Amino acid sequence: MTFTIMTDSTADLNQTWAEDHDIVLIGLTILCDGEVYETVGPNRISSDYLLKKMKAGSHPQTSQINVGEFEKVFREHARNNKALLYLAFSSVLSGTYQSALMACDLVREDYPDAVIEIVDTLAAAGGEGYLTILAAEARDSGKNLLETKDIVEAVIPRLRTYFLVDDLFHLMRGGRLSKGSAFLGSLASIKPLLWIDEEGKLVPIAKIRGRQKAIKEMVAQVEKDIADSTVIVSYTSDQGSAEKLREELLAHENISDVLMMPLGPVISAHVGPNTLAVFVIGQNSR
């Protein structure tokens, strides 16, 4: 039986690619200067537009996908006897995953045999996107829903996410980083390198003076443990630094391909401009 793969706008997947690969995107929303912006569809807000507003002093807020939105999608699939695999934005960073679980319970009251599987990716941005790409490849190769789910869940503990943020104020403001860590990063051009740990929390792993040294440390962290030769690089604003990071990664003998994936508006709202991120699958668990 064929099945639908669905993920959030936080996966930062190109919408044309998603449509071509039969991936359903469901969007979080952004509130900025009294306006509510969509993050999927033809009227979605762009990251560049949002970042310009942030540079001008705006403080956007993001809203999780609510139960009703999930229920609508899940109910439609159940009514049409169509199986669905939903890869959710990290439960540590958003309540979206919990909303999906609640919606699933509501739908199963009327459709007890509905095939709806929900995976907490413990990931965001290119990491969530990476898992969705793997799921699409598995489905295209003939794997069924449960086999595809197993493949994704086996990779989650080995997915490594590294972030280099120019200004930690945005992460602190959104509650994604402690005030102490943010203050430390503001001292004397110290650039904390962050990663998502085994619990899905965003934590500093190194403190480096200067952006270029921090980028080199990011590459060094990636080189420690690589299982898949494909790496994803994401960025806001500074595409030039992202291209240099890509070149440094490609110089590694175990990396054959680096996908460039701009950070979408939801993640951009929390990290701000001049952010770099790398997503890689390691051999060992985090």
Swiss-Prot record:
The protein in question is named: DegV domain-containing protein SpyM3_1667
Task: Give one Pfam family.
Answer: DegV
Q: Which SUPFAM superfamilies match?
A: DAK1/DegV-like
Organism, per UniProt? Streptococcus pyogenes serotype M3 (strain ATCC BAA-595 / MGAS315)
- Chain coiled-coil ranges: none
Q: Which GO terms describe its molecular function?
A: lipid binding
Chain's role? May bind long-chain fatty acids, such as palmitate, and may play a role in lipid transport or fatty acid metabolism.
InterPro entries assigned to the protein according to its UniProt record, in alphabetical order:
DegV (IPR003797), DegV_C (IPR043168), DegV_domain_contain (IPR050270)
| UniProt xrefs under NCBIfam families | DegV
Which taxonomic lineage does the organism of this UniProt entry have? Bacteria, Bacillati, Bacillota, Bacilli, Lactobacillales
Binding, hexadecanoate? 62, 94
Could you list this entry's UniProt keywords, alphabetically sorted.
Answer: Lipid-binding
Occurrences of domain DegV (ranges): 3-282
